Amino acid sequence: MRRLTHDEYDNTIRDLFGVKLNVTERFPTELIGNSGFENSSNTLFLQSSLMERYIGAAQTVVDLALPAEPSTSEHFRTRGLIFRNELELNSSEEEASSSVLSEFLTRAYRRPTTEQELLSATQQFVEGRGNGLSYEEAIKQVIQSALISPKF
């Protein structure tokens, strides 16, 4: 399975959320293979300790980039980048979430989102809402899942 290098991960997070968080500082040191390249697929395997760090990093990214109560211009800019007033522009939360998630997943996966991926993400949103999460909390839950997906 292909994964991002630490630098690629941090840069992708910066591009997605518009903030530089450097969450990979707590990741295990990357090994450089005989090729001399950091991004050689021969050395970028996924250790269990690294997977745990990815899960923690996804939570950290969502918490720091999209806090429940934004207090800085950077927070408001990031929220605008992700949520984009879709809830006001669409007739239902499900339509709004589908629009927000389609845009985010396309950027996160660096390719067009498939119909099945969007359906699955929207279903996760609906389940989150059914479990008592707010609109934004349910969106953030799906975003966190996307950040640990092999497609990311």
Task: List each language-model region with its residue ranges.
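Low-complexity, glycine/serine/threonine/alanine-rich intrinsically disordered linker
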Residues: 1-152
